[in-house]
Every structure is written in structure tokens, then in C-alpha cells.
Amino acid sequence: MSMHIDGKKITEMYWGGRKIREAWYGGERVFSGSKPVEVMPPISGSNWDARDWLRSKLKEYGENYQTVTEIPFEIDTGEATSMRGMFALCSSLTVVPEMDTSRVDNMAYMFSTCESLTTVPPMDTRNVTNMAYMFRNARNITYIPDLSTGGVRSLGYMFYGCARLTDGNVRLIGKRSFAAVGGMIERSGLTREPFYNSSGRPI
């Protein structure tokens, strides 16, 4: 939910001359820091609803998904289980907001063709089963925080085209038996599939 006055979204709030960090209404956070909060619906499955929702919200803020450099709102993702393609083709995006991903099981194509990203925030991926094409053609990404991948079934083409991502700058913790990894590191800067055990040793 975001807050409006005369049809315009509130981007800053003050009380007694001081900027307000958070505002709540009816038990729901509607404003955080200097950005409003948008609540992502309980999206699930293998469709493109997460992508379509984000693009629709960006349009409400006068932004285009291909040219936006920073998301102009915080995203409450606590009810979502799919982020398939959420930021796909956001080719000018340089910053990804921190999000609650604890319930998410599908991250396929999530950052596909995010050509301006150099990193992403830490993500809880314990419940994720699909990471296929997740960073495909994110050609300028150089570092990815550790991702839990013990339950992931599909990792095909995950880092395809990540030319600046090199060994040691991404660690996938755990590998499921018979996980699909075809094309995982093709055309990337990686020389091996970046799987590690919980002790930090390569698998």
C-alpha cells in the first residue's frame, strides 16, 4: 500500500520538522524511510505475474522498467512465493531493494538481462526450487552473496552471459542430487560450477 494526497504518491513525510522513518495504518506499514511501501500480492506459480506487477507499479510512479535505475518504493514481499522474472529486462537498474524472500520457491529469470547490476542484496533462498536463467545476461554483475541451493532442482543457464562474474565471487551452498545445471556457466567468467558445502569447501 502507498499513501496519496490529491492523487499524488507521498515520497517524504515530516512531523515537527523531522523526517518520519515509518508510518503504519490499520496494522500495515505504508511508508518506510524516504520511500513508500508497495505490498506485493501472494503471487505463486510459474507465470510472469511478479514481472507484470512490478512493471505496473513502476508505471504508476512514472517510471519505465527499461530505464529505471532504482526502484522508487520499498516492496513488501512477505506473501509472495514466486518472483519469476520480477526484474527481467530492467537493463538500467543499478540497485535492487532488500526483500523478504523466505517463502519464495521460484526465482527463474529474476534478474535476467539486468545489464547494469553489479551485485544483489542477500536473499533467503532455502525454499527455492527453480533458479533457471536467474542471472542470465546480467553481464556486469561481479559479486553475488551466498545462496542456499540444497533444494534447487533447476539451475540451467543460471549465470549464462555473466562475463564479469569470476570464481570466488559467488557461492551456491549445497547441491541437490540430479539438479539440472545445463549451460549454467556458459559465456560467464566462471571456470567451474560454484557449488560449495556448508563448510565452504567446493563440491
How would you name each of these model-derived features?
Residues S2-E12, G16-I203:
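Negatively charged
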